[in-house]
């Protein structure tokens, strides 16, 4: 128990600091919340318990009353026409321009700093994957002489960019490099506030810290305070497009956002930059539109598949979130060559959502027991007494996973499907326990809840979904690494569990699911909801730092492409749970994100 508490970063029960905010978001209140939304007076929320006059048999036999809003998209993508000629032209232009960009990157006339700045720009524009090998070679060589490169460098933006690029590619550049920007009192110098771009870059890289690097927390607070004060003000050297870029970064910092959304916003910003490189800008626009073609084709394929399954009408209690599930595949990898992977991830996510919603939102306790037993066997027995809807659920799981296995077998990648199903068995057993708590109104301790909740987080399964379609990595080696229960996966489980529990708190409590992490924390420590949410944010933040540390420390024995998926999972959580549960209720910010990725191409002129 003590080891568990240490890993979660749990506070002393008698020393829980107060939090006066009424906002339940897992993340600090961002600019848009501070400047555009009126804050309601803080109210104290206490532990929610369910008391019922029903017998235990009645409670176990009760069916929850749950409503999810309909799909925002329906069959929209079936009616979207794609011009194959336009697609081919985009591909030709990209291939024509790639040598030009590569020549810039490999130029012998460029210094190490200039090359690293160019790499940073390519990453920001979403184009770096075209030159991944070249970039890794450049950075591997540059990192060996890092001390010589940064000696005497006193530009905050330059140091911050180098810090970001090296860490993103697995080289742990020391945060001691920022000591040059601190005064004798150990604090960051106030004179830095004049450097708008440097402060913005410092704020972004502050999210790449590890658990032992307190200086990065100081950098984040210092930079954010100054950036906040500039919004709405008249800062010398800050143009309107730069202020808008700052506003976007404060709302969702780069490393709390998925790569393709970062690129979409940065392209618009870079186009307005004076002296931008026209070749790089055009290449980035072509690349984004080329990627978007893939996404739309994937969604056309997925929409037809989902329509043919007809589960949304057969099982009206489930969340009809196909496009949001595709976003769940786009977060881990946005590149065109992972198109098959995204389709597989979206299919499995939707299949798992069907099962999850059956546990959470529809099945009775006896039905849950039968469902769990069938999932352990991975078949429906002749003696199983199943209601029709439950048979539909199970048949859909077996059918979808069977089709994926059959599709991947000729590619020599069916091993992963079996591994994912084995992991899913564990999730099903844990879901059964959560359902029993929910139906009986039991609120376990936070420690007891997390033992089960971390299993239902299922990040080893999510990673497995992604590995199935990654033909550039050894499937067996990737799953063997997963089976070692790496620390990065453990930390991701904590992050997802807490993000989901805070984001879905109101919804779950309203339908009687009192076994929620936030509620359980309130019970164990005798604190209010506001105090509990503050502590869960700290635990979330600590585990995100663990993810970053393990990402860098594992590059010597785990393929970079595997580790990137894990880093990108953490970024996806931040997007999905910025404002509540963006997957279940996407209306608003998530809808806007999806529209920018799936509907509107970038004008080329």
Swiss-Prot record:
It is found in: Cytoplasm. The gene is TPS18. The Asp-Asp-Xaa-Xaa-Asp/Glu (DDXXD/E) motif is important for the catalytic activity, presumably through binding to Mg(2+). It is an enzyme of class 4 (lyase). This is Terpenoid synthase 18. Signal peptide: none annotated. InterPro entries: Isoprenoid_synthase_dom_sf, Terpene_cyclase-like_1_C, Terpene_cyclase_plant_C1, Terpene_synth_N, Terpene_synth_N_sf, Terpene_synthase-like, Terpene_synthase_metal-bd, Terpenoid_cyclase/PrenylTrfase. GO terms for cellular component: cytoplasm. Belongs to the terpene synthase family. Tpsa subfamily. Pathway: Secondary metabolite biosynthesis; terpenoid biosynthesis. GO terms for biological process: diterpenoid biosynthetic process. Binds 3 Mg(2+) or Mn(2+) ions per subunit. Mg(2+) 2 binds at residues 356, 360. One of its GO terms (molecular function) is terpene synthase activity. A motif (DDXXD motif) lies at residues 356-360. Its EC number is 4.2.3.-. Keywords: Cytoplasm, Lyase, Magnesium, Manganese, Metal-binding. Mg(2+) 1 binds at residues 356, 360. It comes from the Eukaryota. Its cofactor is Mg(2+); Mn(2+). Predominantly expressed in flowers and siliques but also in roots and leaves. Mg(2+) 3 binds at residues 500, 504, 508.
């Amino acid at each position: 128990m003590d080891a568990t508490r240490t890993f979660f970063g749990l506070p002393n029960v008698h020393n829980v600091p107060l939090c006066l905010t009424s906002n339940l978001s897992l993340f600090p209140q961002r600019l848009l919340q501070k400047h555009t939304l009126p804050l309601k007076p803080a109210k104290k929320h206490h532990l929610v318990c369910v008391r019922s006059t029903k017998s235990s048999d009645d409670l176990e036999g009760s069916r929850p009353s749950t409503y999810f809003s309909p799909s925002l998209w329906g069959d929209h993508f079936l009616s979207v026409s794609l011009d194959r000629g336009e697609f081919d032209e985009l591909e030709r232009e990209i291939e024509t321009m790639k040598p030009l960009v590569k020549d810039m990157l490999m130029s012998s006339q460029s210094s190490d700093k200039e090359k690293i700045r160019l790499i940073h720009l390519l990453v920001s524009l979403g184009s770096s994957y075209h030159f991944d090998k070249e970039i890794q070679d450049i950075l591997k060589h540059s990192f060996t002489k890092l001390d010589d490169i940064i000696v005497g460098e006193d530009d905050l933006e330059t140091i911050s960019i180098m810090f970001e690029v090296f860490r993103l590619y697995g080289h742990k550049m020391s945060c001691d490099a920022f000591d040059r920007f601190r005064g004798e009192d150990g604090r960051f110098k106030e004179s830095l506030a004049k450097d708008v771009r440097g402060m913005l870059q410092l704020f972004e890289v502050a999210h790449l810290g590890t658990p032992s690097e307190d200086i990065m927390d100081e950098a984040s607070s210092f930079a954010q305070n100054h950036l906040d004060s500039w919004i709405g003000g008249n800062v010398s050297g800050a143009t309107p497009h730069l202020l808008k870029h700052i506003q976007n970064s404060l709302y969702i910092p780069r490393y709390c956002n998925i790569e393709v959304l970062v690129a979409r916003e940065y392209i618009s910003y870079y186009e307005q930059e004076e002296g931008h490189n026209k070749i790089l800008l055009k290449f980035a626009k072509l690349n984004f539109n080329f990627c978007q073609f893939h996404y739309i084709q994937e969604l056309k394929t997925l929409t037809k598949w989902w329509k043919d399954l007809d589960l949304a009408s057969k099982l009206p209690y489930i969340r009809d979130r196909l496009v949001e599930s595709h976003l769940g595949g786009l977060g881990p990898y946005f590149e065109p060559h992972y198109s098959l992977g995204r389709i597989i991830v979206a299919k499995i996510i939707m299949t798992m959502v069907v099962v999850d919603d059956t546990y959470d939102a529809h099945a009775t306790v006896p039905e849950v027991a039968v469902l769990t037993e069938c999932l352990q066997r991975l078949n429906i027995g002749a003696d199983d007494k199943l209601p029709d809807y439950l048979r539909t659920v199970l048949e859909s799981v077996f059918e979808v996973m069977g089709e994926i296995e059959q599709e991947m077998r000729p590619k020599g990648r069916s091993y992963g499907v079996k591994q994912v199903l084995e992991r899913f068995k564990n999730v099903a057993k844990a879901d059964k326990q959560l359902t029993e708590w929910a139906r009986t109104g039991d609120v376990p301790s936070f420690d007891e809840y997390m033992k089960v909740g971390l299993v239902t987080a299922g990040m080893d399964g999510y990673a497995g979904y992604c590995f199935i379609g990654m033909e550039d990595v050894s499937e067996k080696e990737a799953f063997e690494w997963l089976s070692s229960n790496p620390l990065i996966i453990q930390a991701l489980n904590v992050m997802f569990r807490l993000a989901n529990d805070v984001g879905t708190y109101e919804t779950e409590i309203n339908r009687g699911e009192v076994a929620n992490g936030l509620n359980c924390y309130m019970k164990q420590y005798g604190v209010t909801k506001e105090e509990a949410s503050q502590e869960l944010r700290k635990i979330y933040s600590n585990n995100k730092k663990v993810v970053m540390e393990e990402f860098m420390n594992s590059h010597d024995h785990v393929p970079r492409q595997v580790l990137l998926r894990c880093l990108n999972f953490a970024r996806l959580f931040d997007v999905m749970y910025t404002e509540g549960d963006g997957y279940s209720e996407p209306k608003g910010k998530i809808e806007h994100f999806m529209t920018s990725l799936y509907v509107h191409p970038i004008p080329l002129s």
